């Protein structure tokens, strides 16, 4: 399983808020895409040397959001991300 500790933390967070009802595969995929777009937005209209500490902090937050939704979607389909990466490399 992909990062079981993170998945456990995420699932507890979701359960406390009664959000399971909203987490069908379609909504998980949409949320993953939306968060990925927020990563892209940080780099829009900038040059490489314009990425400052504030943007790096924002990037960290957005990457965490992407990881959150990626783990949930993978977990829904019992996909181990590390195994999928290994298989993809072959």
Regions found by a protein language model. Name each.
Residues 1-63, 67-90:
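Flexible "arm" and connector segments at domain edges
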């Amino acid at each position: 399983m992909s990062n079981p500790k993170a998945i456990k933390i995420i699932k507890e967070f979701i359960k406390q808020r009664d959000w399971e009802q909203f987490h069908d595969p379609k909504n998980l995929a949409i949320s993953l895409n939306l968060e990925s777009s927020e990563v892209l937005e940080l780099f829009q209209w900038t040059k490489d040397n314009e990425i400052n500490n504030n943007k790096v902090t924002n990037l960290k937050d957005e990457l965490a959001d992407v990881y959150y939704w990626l783990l949930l979607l993978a977990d829904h389909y019992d996909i181990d991300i590390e195994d999928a990466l290994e298989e993809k490399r072959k």
